[in-house]
Regions:
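Solvent-exposed soluble domains appended to multi-pass membrane proteins
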Residues: 1-190
């Protein structure tokens, strides 16, 4: 229905079925003797079938598909090679034909999930002045990410700082107390 309106739209869905202990549909036939393995297989298979279905639709030509793995599996003992270099899986399929980028900017980047916001918008054809939104950098640009520019240690230290203004004016504009966790125990509530 959204396609038929002729207006741009976004559809987002999350597959949480691969969170521990694995939540495969009771309707599927188990392929493995392990619930978690079945959940991973089922999730990947359903995602594949959904993408193949989209490719057959009239709106595919104008559709950017983004698959983001927001973290590694929390069931680390499931994987046999514990020393392997496991990484998140991220895919941008069918980006806008207007997207211009150098292949060099896609390799060996130091980036974070913050960068996915402007990167996804750019993949959809949105022009971003300065190639940055919030803390994120469009990874299709040659602009350095905040982690490339300042390093992990510095950025993480800055992000860990507390902001009295933010806590009192944004999180608690009506003065209600907010539970806080602070490593130096100087402040328990905003």
């Amino acid at each position: 229905r959204l396609y038929k309106t002729g207006k741009p739209f976004n559809m987002t869905f999350e597959t949480a079925d691969t969170h521990t202990p694995g939540y495969a549909s009771p309707k599927i036939k188990n392929k493995f003797n392990n619930q978690y393995a079945n959940a991973i297989y089922y999730s990947q298979n359903e995602t594949y079938k959904f993408i193949e279905w989209i490719k057959q639709q009239p709106f595919y030509e104008n559709t950017t598909i983004v698959i983001i793995g927001d973290h590694l599996s929390m069931c680390s003992d499931f994987f046999k090679n514990k020393n392997g270099n496991r990484t998140q899986y991220n895919l941008i399929l069918n980006p806008s034909p207007d997207l211009k980028y150098s292949k060099d900017c896609l390799k060996n980047r130091t980036w974070s999930n913050y960068d996915m916001y402007p990167t996804v918008l750019a993949a959809m054809g949105v022009k971003i002045e300065g190639n940055r939104l919030g803390l994120g950098t469009d990874l299709f640009s040659n602009e350095p990410t905040v982690f490339e520019e300042f390093g992990y240690d510095y950025v993480n230290k800055e992000l860990a700082k507390k902001s009295e203004f933010y806590n009192k004016r944004i999180l608690s504009p009506n003065g209600e107390k907010i539970a806080m966790h602070n490593t130096d125990d100087n402040q328990k509530y905003a």
